[in-house]
Curated annotation (Swiss-Prot):
<dbReference type="Pfam" id="PF02673">
    <property type="entry name" value="BacA"/>
</dbReference>
<dbReference type="GO" id="GO:0071555">
    <property type="term" value="P:cell wall organization"/>
</dbReference>
<comment type="function">
    <text>Catalyzes the dephosphorylation of undecaprenyl diphosphate (UPP). Confers resistance to bacitracin.</text>
</comment>
<keyword id="KW-0133">Cell shape</keyword>
<dbReference type="GO" id="GO:0005886">
    <property type="term" value="C:plasma membrane"/>
</dbReference>
<keyword id="KW-0046">Antibiotic resistance</keyword>
<dbReference type="GO" id="GO:0046677">
    <property type="term" value="P:response to antibiotic"/>
</dbReference>
<keyword id="KW-0472">Membrane</keyword>
<keyword id="KW-0961">Cell wall biogenesis/degradation</keyword>
<dbReference type="GO" id="GO:0008360">
    <property type="term" value="P:regulation of cell shape"/>
</dbReference>
<keyword id="KW-1133">Transmembrane helix</keyword>
<feature type="transmembrane region" description="Helical">
    <location>
        <begin position="43"/>
        <end position="63"/>
    </location>
</feature>
<keyword id="KW-0378">Hydrolase</keyword>
<feature type="transmembrane region" description="Helical">
    <location>
        <begin position="186"/>
        <end position="206"/>
    </location>
</feature>
<keyword id="KW-1003">Cell membrane</keyword>
<feature type="transmembrane region" description="Helical">
    <location>
        <begin position="109"/>
        <end position="129"/>
    </location>
</feature>
<protein>
    <recommendedName>
        <fullName>Undecaprenyl-diphosphatase 2</fullName>
        <ecNumber>3.6.1.27</ecNumber>
    </recommendedName>
</protein>
């Protein structure tokens, strides 16, 4: 393997780490950029799983204190911790069920540049609409522990829609939260928590299906991609939490729309 191959692995790891938690669609970017740089690997599916694990690990590290407190609270029968754990599972289960049943059909039918471009534009327009509603700043829920069953269900449904490449899991769940009365900052933080079981579940499922593709010749490239995703996700998650506390998501909406139009213009 040459140096260019490892550079491509690093580049895709960075793209995964940056785009996974921004409302701009990591899957869409990986599809587009993977084709653009002609990245091919005998274990391409395994590579995608591993770099997603890098992003998951970054979130777990950043929220380690809250995660430990949550686990301890659940084990000690703390009602607040147990309620929050149930809320997260309610948001997680719809996508877990639909993903397990239809993920292969979704990938076979929807994983193409036309769908990605369309979803980017439509998602961008929805974000602009949500951010510019007259009641957009009248949120009732400012703390993730106050998120209720109604909000959890709406966010869970939104996450199902995000299975369409180009939609963005984080974007859909944040918008779902905001539409149900959760503040932008709280919706963003909840989206990160929800990402842990969602991405971990998807990674375990994909790994169980594709572990036989693992080849020791690509271990170094996989480790490079994993490390790049982990470090870039650490930076992005921290930055996004600070950003959404003071700014709207409109800048990401315009980026999505512009990228979608560019994709249509070159295809």
């Amino acid at each position: 393997m040459d140096l260019i191959y490892f550079i491509k692995a690093f580049f895709l790891g960075v793209i995964e780490g940056i785009t996974e938690f921004l409302p701009i669609s990591s899957t869409g970017h990986l599809i587009l950029i993977g084709d653009w740089i002609n990245f091919s690997s005998n274990e391409e599916k395994v590579f995608e799983v591993v770099i997603q694990l890098g992003g998951i690990l970054a979130v777990c590290w950043l929220f380690r204190d809250k995660i430990i407190n949550l686990i301890n609270g659940v084990l000690k029968s703390d009602p607040v911790a147990q309620r929050f754990a149930v809320i997260v599972m309610i948001s997680f289960l719809p996508s877990a069920i639909i993903g397990a049943l239809f993920i292969h059909d979704i990938k076979n039918v929807l994983f193409n540049t036309t769908v990605v471009a369309t979803a980017l534009i439509v998602g961008g327009l929805i974000i602009l609409w949500v951010e510019n509603r007259k009641d957009s700043e009248k949120f009732k829920i400012e703390n993730i522990e106050k998120i209720g069953f109604k909000q959890a269900i709406i966010i869970g449904i939104a996450q199902c829609i995000a299975m369409i490449p180009g939609t963005s899991r984080s974007g859909a769940t944040i918008v779902g939260g905001m539409l149900s009365g959760v503040s932008r900052k709280a919706a963003t933080e909840y989206s990160f928590f929800l990402a842990i079981p969602t991405m971990l579940g998807a990674a375990i499922y994909d790994a169980s299906k594709n572990y036989h593709l693992l080849n020791t010749d690509d271990i170094l490239a996989i480790l490079i991609g994993f490390s790049a995703a982990f470090i870039s996700a650490l930076i992005v998650v921290n930055a996004l939490i600070r950003f959404v506390a003071k700014h709207s998501l409109s800048v990401f909406a315009w980026y999505r729309i512009a990228l979608g139009l560019i994709i249509f213009s070159v295809n």
